[in-house]
Amino acid sequence: MNQEDKEKPIEEASSSMEREHMFDKVVTPSDVGKLNRLVIPKQHAERYFPLDNSTTNDSNKGLLLNFEDRSGNSWRFRYSYWNSSQSYVMTKGWSRFVKDKKLDAGDIVSFQRDSCNKDKLYIDWRRRPKIPDHHHQQFAGAMFPRFYTFPHPQMPTNYETHNLYHRFHQRDLGIGYYVRSMERSHPTAVIESVPVMMQRRAQVASMASRGEKRLRLFGVDMECGGGGGSVNSTEEESSSSGGSIPRGRVSMVGAGSLLQLRLVSSDDESLVAMEAASLEDHHFFTKKGKPSLSFDLDR
């Protein structure tokens, strides 16, 4: 008895090794539904279960195929060709196999045959592979990544100035982002150690004291007045303020009047002031009655 028990597994193993795998079919919802039929792929049907012309033309006919499962139970299916759908199907007996094995959509049915006896067929099944739960989480994480709020770095408060322009410092956070420090409030520009705003206020005060009038024409401030010695007061005012004479000054001198164009450069705006004053003293002219043109450019 012991020797026979040892020989049985050997025979079963040898028989399983002699089986030839034909094809696998993943059952669809219609294969396990109310249609009571299993669709066989055309390439596999014509290769392993060929039908003659008479069987193909009559869908009611067909072949009766006998299969054996892993438990040794026999299963008989009617195999035929449907002209309406142009497909090869197993009909009769298939619904009973589905109920017995409790097949569901996605399960796999395997067809085999004996390598020596081609007419001896086997059928087997296995459940659909289970997808791990974390796979969906990883996929969802790849499609919809989480967004984290990164802390805002504290930028240094000291800024360097060069030629009245601020340098924008960049700081690499190590996460692919660059943060630039933007300073909205610019300090008052200083030209030759004298603030522009203070110089402008001094000019307005001097104009009021001399009784001059100010006119804005075509976006240019025109300063007109009849007081004498306006040039001297302007030069004295500039020298007393610590040499805050603008970098460029063009003076046009006439016989009875003086036209002075002053260009002031600052960080925020350009101030253009034109002063016109009548001169009673003609000691500024080398020749009386003749106009002269002078350019005074301070660099």
From Swiss-Prot:
UniProt entry tagged with the keyword Nucleus: yes
Disulfides per UniProt: none
CC annotations in GO: nucleus
CDD domains per the UniProt record, alphabetical: B3_DNA
The keyword Transcription is assigned to this record: yes
GO MF terms held by the record: DNA binding; DNA-binding transcription factor activity
Annotated DNA-binding residue span(s): 23-129
InterPro entries (alphabetical): B3_DNA-bd (IPR003340), DNA-bd_pseudobarrel_sf (IPR015300), LEC2-like (IPR044800)
Biological-process GO terms, alphabetical: flower development; leaf development; regulation of leaf morphogenesis
Superkingdom of origin: Eukaryota
Function as written in the Swiss-Prot or TrEMBL entry: Regulates lateral organ growth. Functionally redundant with NGA1, NGA3 and NGA4.
Protein name as annotated: B3 domain-containing transcription factor NGA2
The species this protein was found in: Arabidopsis thaliana (Mouse-ear cress)
Originating gene: NGA2
